[in-house]
Amino acid sequence: MPKMKTKKSAAKRFRVRPGGTVKRGQAFKRHILTKKSTKNKRHLRGTATVHETNMGHMAQMLPFAGL
């Protein structure tokens, strides 16, 4: 069986919280911000949580995260 490896791109983008949920950054805030309203950009600040339907993929990408 091959060695399990962590997907480094995922390890840099996600953090596992103590409760087992995964924290992620918001999308749609890197460029083309002039057409977005101030309210829309304000709501894109901060972080969000990965949805339960994607947690299986997270466990595959981060095998040592304890998910």
Curated annotation (Swiss-Prot):
InterPro entries for the chain = Ribosomal_bL35 (IPR001706), Ribosomal_bL35-like (IPR021137), Ribosomal_bL35_CS (IPR018265), Ribosomal_bL35_sf (IPR037229)
Keywords (alphabetical) are:
Ribonucleoprotein, Ribosomal protein
The answer on whether this UniProt entry bears the keyword Calcium reads: no
Q: Give start-end positions of Basic residues composition bias.
A: 1-16
Q: Which cysteines are joined by disulfide bonds?
A: none
Q: Name one Pfam family in it.
A: Ribosomal_L35p
Protein's name in the database? Large ribosomal subunit protein bL35
Per the UniProt record, the source organism is Methylibium petroleiphilum (strain ATCC BAA-1232 / LMG 22953 / PM1)
Q: Which gene encodes it?
A: rpmI
